[in-house]
Amino acid sequence: SRRFGSDKALISFAGMKLIEYIYRNLDQNFKKVIVVGSKAEYSFLKGAEIREDIFQNKGPLAGIYTGLYFSKSRYNFICGCDMPFLNSQYFNFLKEEIRIHPKKEIIVPRYNNYLEPLAAIYQQSLLTKIKDEILNDNLKIKSFYNNSSKKVISEELLKRNFDLEKLSKKIGRLVDKKELQNLLMKTYLIRKGEEYGINE
């Protein structure tokens, strides 16, 4: 999606673009990362597996489908390009939820009384259900949820484990580009400090 007059995934800070920062973060926490988007636009992501939507112009639901289609994993974490504040603690938390609820097709967090479908776990077995929704032009991102088994992670549980306000912050909710770049830079520096054993 677009904001600040351009694709928000391409906003730059710390010598990299937002999508590159998110990709590196995911690549450090998962065995394989698939980027769904334009190969030409994201060609700077060296070593990344980039796949273009199988169903064009069908929105985020088509992105979920494409990611699952090219994945070889039973369980898949899917996120948007506008949530750079997800971290390894959250990823490990979701992996533990998979261990506890291995049969659930969807493991999704709830925040502010809404499910967050682009920070969730999806089983590859959902492919047929999602494809049917796309072919029927039911393009709401959660169109297949009612016919799928899911574990909803309560907001209370999330709050006990995370700084939920920051974790759930989306780029699209920030109005000022400079504010966004400053926030991203701060997060980047904190993570670099943690990597080298340096505290704030």
Predicted region positions:
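Nucleotide and nucleotide-moiety/phosphate-recognizing core
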Residues: 1-138, 143-164, 191
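Glycine-rich phosphate/pyrophosphate-binding loop and the adjoining helix
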Residues: 157-193
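Acidic/polar hotspots within intrinsically disordered regions
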Residues: 196-199
